[in-house]
């Protein structure tokens, strides 16, 4: 049925199915676990879309991808047209197709979700870019007329890459600065390879360079290059440095030996797997260890799934709410359970138990969910006399991240809120503009720790603000 007449019952006849490797196989490596679609499977899955009059999937997507339209093109075998359309709204579609929590975004909003299984939108999105790029498709910038304007982009993460993508398509030369030796930010160093193959990130860098984007790596603004130089030499500056400072639990024992922040653990492991130079002490090996990860978001899932691949003796994930109210991707919880992770729901850590300065366990109290908080999520309330200790040799803190803006922000009039988030929109209608009219920002620096796709949206929006500012 792939390229023949539309089957009105295709959503019934073709099941939602995204194949993945058997558990025993995927635990032996740090590579992606999902099998990609070939042309026929992609067309069959895309053909399940029933072309809703009001496409909720499109509106639930933070970048408002033209999902029904490119599903239709894939079903008809028009791959390059689908790639062109996909790249119109999303600067990193092959990445978002892999790591977006589609179950609570586009696929969660799919009309078929309740009774028949949502269209596998993420897998089709991944297929479109992967296959089109492999066949030689590239964004067409041949008709772009250079404006002579130059913009400095600080941070080569998703917000910075998205900003650069929009700018170069409009004739503005972006120069992207990053302190790391590879492009991608947390795409490269914070998200494990079993979710995102790093060659995918490197290919997107290559594409952007072919379009004309310039990268200057191993360069930290404020240390290697003064921010003042950027204000002098460029027509505008975009700040997309992300969030790297971890949120502490505020309970006793966090400074004990054997307790690690999630990002330090993940970055050290990813650099080790990739064979990139690093201090050996930054690599934390969990082989044979009893590991407890505190937190219920996607970063916690990355940590538990990394630990089982390192050969941990046992891995527990402790979260203070129930499974239904956890913030992470449901698919990632399923994967973690399949791989042997034990989840302890409704447990609030209150102390890391130590022996001679080293962690030996986590004391947690059981909770029950009470009234909603300001964000609408039910508050966990401790149950008296329910404390218990979970044995642990290693503890990973994965409570999220917050901005850690550099000191030079104050010097150049870049305002922040009480949580360190960069304030934008102070000067009127220009999207992403800070209190310093020449400086724009977006992504986690503005929102706080959030999704890759929302950072992409912010980077693209700020680029439009910059174009308006430059009168391009």
Where are these regions (language model features)?
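Immediate flanking context of iron-sulfur cluster ligation sites
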Residues: 35-55, 79-105
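FAD-binding core/adjacent interface of flavoenzyme oxidoreductases
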Residues: 70, 94-96, 103-154, 170, ...
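FAD-site-proximal beta/loop scaffold in flavoenzymes
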Residues: 255-288, 372-449
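Long hydrophobic segments that form regular secondary structure
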Residues: 284-321, 388-394, 401-402, 420, ...
């Amino acid at each position: 049925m792939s390229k023949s007449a539309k089957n009105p019952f295709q959503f019934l006849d073709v099941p939602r199915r995204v194949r993945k490797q058997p558990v025993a196989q995927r635990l032996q490596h740090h590579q992606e676990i999902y099998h990609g679609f070939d042309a026929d499977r992609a067309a069959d899955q895309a053909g399940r879309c029933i072309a809703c009059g009001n496409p909720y999937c499109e509106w639930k997507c933070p970048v408002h991808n033209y999902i029904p339209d490119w599903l239709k093109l894939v079903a008809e075998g028009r791959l390059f047209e689908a790639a062109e359309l996909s790249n119109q709204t999303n600067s990193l579609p092959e990445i978002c197709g892999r790591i977006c929590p589609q179950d609570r975004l586009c696929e969660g909003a799919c009309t078929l979700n309740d009774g028949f299984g949502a269209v596998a939108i993420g897998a089709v999105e991944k297929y479109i870019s992967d296959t089109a790029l492999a066949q030689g498709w590239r964004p067409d910038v041949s008709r772009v007329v250079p404006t002579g304007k130059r913009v400095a982009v600080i941070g080569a993460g998703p917000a910075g890459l998205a900003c650069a993508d929009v700018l170069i398509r409009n004739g503005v030369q972006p120069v992207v600065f990053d302190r790391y030796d590879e492009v991608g930010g947390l795409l490269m160093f914070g998200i494990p390879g079993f979710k995102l193959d790093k060659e995918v990130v490197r290919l997107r860098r290559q594409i952007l360079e072919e379009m004309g984007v310039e990268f200057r790596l191993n360069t930290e603004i404020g240390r290697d290059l003064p921010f003042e130089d950027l204000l002098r030499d460029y027509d505008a500056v975009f700040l997309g440095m992300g969030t790297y400072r971890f949120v502490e639990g505020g309970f006793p024992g966090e400074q004990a030996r054997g307790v690690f922040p999630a990002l330090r653990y993940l970055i050290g492991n990813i650099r080790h797997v990739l064979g990139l130079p690093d201090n050996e002490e930054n690599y934390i090996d969990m082989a044979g260890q009893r590991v407890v990860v505190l937190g219920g978001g996607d970063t916690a899932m990355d940590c538990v799934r990394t630990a089982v691949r390192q050969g941990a003796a046992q891995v527990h994930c402790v979260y203070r709410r129930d499974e239904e109210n956890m913030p992470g991707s449901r698919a990632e919880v399923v994967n973690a359970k399949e791989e042997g992770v034990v989840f302890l729901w409704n447990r609030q850590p209150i102390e890391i138990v130590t022996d001679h300065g080293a962690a030996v366990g986590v004391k947690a109290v059981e909770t029950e969910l009470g009234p909603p908080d300001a964000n609408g999520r039910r508050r966990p309330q401790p149950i008296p006399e329910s404390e218990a200790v979970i044995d642990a040799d290693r503890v990973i803190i994965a409570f999220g991240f917050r901005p850690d803006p550099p000191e030079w922000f104050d010097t150049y009039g870049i305002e922040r809120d009480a949580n360190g988030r960069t304030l934008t929109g102070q000067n009127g209608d220009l999207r992403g503009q800070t209190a310093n009219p020449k400086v724009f920002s977006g992504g986690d620096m503005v929102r706080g720790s959030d999704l890759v796709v929302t950072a992409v949206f912010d980077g693209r929006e700020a680029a439009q603000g910059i174009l308006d500012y430059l009168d391009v």
